[in-house]
Design a protein with these regions (language model features):
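Edge beta-strands of extracellular beta-sandwich domains
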Residues: 129-140, 212-213
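Exposed beta-strand-loop-beta-strand "reactive/processing" segments of non-cytosolic proteins
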Residues: 108-115, 167-202, 213
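Short, surface-exposed binding/anchoring microloops in extracellular/periplasmic proteins
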Residues: 31-84
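Short, aromatic- and glycine-rich surface loops/edge beta-strands on solvent-exposed regions
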Residues: 84, 115-129
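Bacterial N-terminal signal peptides
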Residues: 2-10
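Aromatic sugar-binding surface patches on proteins
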Residues: 93-109
Length: 215
């Protein structure tokens, strides 16, 4: 009886897998689902809710992702020591920020979830200055969720997604980032294993494609 069960299972498993609805969101290897910002005098702060694969490689292969909070701080110079502290869900986070000479900004990353926050009070110690800033989300009431945004792109670029789908699987990985230039937008990158990328800029409220390019 057990042997008969195994034979039946081996027969039906491919059929079950073939009829399972493909979820393209499963192939998102980098997700920036929230962005909180504040600008004050000579200082600017950006806080990202990020889920990112490790190792972080644009090779068309989706790996396991981890949830992070990434903080970027811009100051008049990078000559001062800099640290950050903040609280999420009653838990305190913080530490020294490293300085990126190329991007000319300080950086801090920690395992914390700010994806659903609308505001985040942050304390920055920059040299002898103590800055108390409150970063606000760039999302609006009508901003699409990342999943809804990807569904909208799939509907608008159905031919492209069909080309990148084989045997009920997406043949690549997806970058999906909430960004802001005066208004919120989404960036989506479709990366295939042959190193090609299809990049899209979309409105955050409707998912309308504003620009696209291939490289």
């Amino acid at each position: 009886m057990f042997l008969l069960f195994l034979v039946a299972l081996s027969f039906f498993s491919p059929l079950i897998q073939a009829t399972k609805k493909l979820d393209y969101f499963d192939y998102v290897s980098e997700l920036r689902s929230n962005l909180l910002t504040v600008n004050e005098k000579d200082y600017s702060l950006r806080v990202y809710a990020v889920e990112k694969e490790y190792p972080y490689v644009a090779d068309g292969i989706k790996r396991e992702t981890t949830l992070r909070t990434e903080i970027y701080f811009t100051a008049p110079t990078g000559d001062e020591s800099c640290s950050v502290t903040f609280t999420v869900d009653g838990k305190n986070y913080g530490g020294e920020m490293s300085y990126d000479n190329v991007k000319a900004e300080y950086f801090y990353s920690v395992s914390a979830d700010v994806s659903k926050l609308e505001r985040l009070p942050v304390e920055i110690v920059y040299g002898k200055d103590v800055l108390r800033l409150t970063a606000l989300t760039v999302k609006k009431a009508n901003t699409l969720s990342p999943r809804a945004l990807l569904d909208a792109l799939k509907d608008n670029e159905r031919e492209t997604f069909n080309q990148l789908t084989e045997d009920n699987a997406f043949v690549g990985e997806i970058y999906l980032r909430l960004i802001c230039e005066d208004e919120p937008y989404y960036y989506v990158g479709l990366i295939t294993k042959d190193g090609k990328m299809r990049a899209y800029l979309l409105t955050a409220d409707t998912g309308k494609v504003l620009a696209k390019r291939e490289s």
